[in-house]
Each structure stands twice: as C-alpha cells, then as structure tokens.
Amino acid sequence: MKNISEQKRKERGMTQQQLAAALGVSRQTIISLENGKYNPSILLAHAIARLFGTQIEDIFLFEEEEA
C-alpha cells in the first residue's frame, strides 16, 4: 500500500525515531512503512493520521489488486 507518511513526517520536521516514539512503534516499523513494505493495522493507521491532523485516506493510498 502506498502512503505519504514520509512526506508528512518531513513536513513536520520529525525524524523516523521521533515518529516511532510518538506512535509507540520501532524505527524499523517506520522505515518499512515509508518503503511500502509494511501495511499498518487500522489502529496504527488511525494514530498516524491523527498525529498528522488528517484522515487515513489522505495518508494511505489504497490500490486494488488486479485479478
């Protein structure tokens, strides 16, 4: 799943470690998330959106898989 979490994090002047600490996850989770290799739980996605003051769908770009 594509997302703009890295862009939002940088706009706020946050490091990956600061974002991880604010969300209660590891820095590795943030790295994987920003690289599109990790799909967060709905709770984590909601926490990220809330932290950035936006909606989940504004951060995470859902793509339908081709059949």
What does each of the following model-derived ranges do?
Residues 8, 42-43, 56:
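Short, Lys/Arg-enriched C-terminal cap helix and immediately downstream tail that follows
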Residues 3-22:
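Short basic helix-loop element that most often maps to the first helix and adjoining turn
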Residues 18, 29, 58:
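Residues in the helix-turn-helix
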Residues 61-67:
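Short, charged recognition helix plus adjacent turn
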Residues 45-49, 59:
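Hydrophobic micro-packing sites on short alpha-helices
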Residues 25-38:
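Recognition helix of helix-turn-helix/homeodomain-like DNA-binding domains
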